[in-house]
Amino acid sequence: LGKMWWISCNQNHFYNYSRKIAYNLEMIYKSKVLELIHSAVKSPRAIILFGSYRKGDDNERSDVDIAVEILGDEELRIIKLGTMPHFGYRYDVPVNIHIFSRNKIDLNLFANIANGIVLEGFLEVRP
């Protein structure tokens, strides 16, 4: 059969993370996900990208996690917004939105969201 070369990059290298985060943000804004969120959630207070796409360690099985803060006392709801048919170099990427109100969220989940990137609005982090 012959020899086959296997080439890969060091995915843990800082350069990959720093460039990939900026690339992921560009793909989020180009994909019109924010418009879909506004049609699904009325009057969001803040829209935050969190999880693997925020950290830059997403892979071919990762989904896009976006948190949406709303006013009120509603329990956390996770809605599958759909799949993005073409999202950068990937196809059929699932997008989930986590709708939460400040008064009814687990503190560990909120800490994860607070370390995300605010795409729109203002996320107030208070003790």
Residue ranges of model-derived segments:
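Catalytic core of pol beta-like nucleotidyltransferases
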Residues: 1-43, 55-61, 70-127
